[in-house]
Amino acid sequence: MPLKTSEPQYGKFGARLCAALAVAAVLACSTASHAQDEAKQKAGLSVWRSSGCSECHGAFANGEKERDEAPTGANLRQTRLDDATIAETIRCGRPGAGMPSFGADAYKERGCYGQPPGPAPDDLYPSALTLSAAQISDVVTYLRARIVGKRAVTPEECAWYYGEQASSNCDAPK
């Protein structure tokens, strides 16, 4: 007796429905991921502002410092550092270059730049502020998404940076 084969219970409509649901699930995950990334970018911007990063690097991280007496920070739009190196630079600072260390565990508890734990270098610029690993990660996310590899500041970028105060700050972004 031959085996009887039958059409799937829901036919072509069922297959299309399953495909549509699969696409919807992928889009929902993508949207949630985008929202989380956007939240980390905003958190990173908040840390960037509250930590005084723009004093040396400029509001848009282009090396145009905001205070004359501050050390001149690198133009992070042109950096070729990977995320791990950016994070280590924030955590450990740049001895001799004016970049302070923002990591509470830098040098003493956790070595920096391949060195074992020990005293901080004498030529490390002092910082009264420390950042958590999560805050440093948020700053790196912000820099990677909004700064690194970008050219001139666009009006949209300026508006995202300044938010509600954009109209008074974005007439001629740098």
Which residue stretches match the model-derived regions?
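Flexible coil segments in periplasmic/lumen-exposed cytochrome c-class electron-transfer proteins
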Residues: 36-40, 50-51, 59, 97-174
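Non-transmembrane alpha-helical segments in soluble domains
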Residues: 45, 87, 91, 137-144
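N-terminal secretory signal peptides that target proteins for export/translocation
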Residues: 1-15
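Short, non-ligating residues that shape and space the ligands of small metal-coordination modules
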Residues: 62-63
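Bacterial N-terminal signal peptides
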Residues: 18-28
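Short Fe-S-cluster ligation motifs
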Residues: 83-104
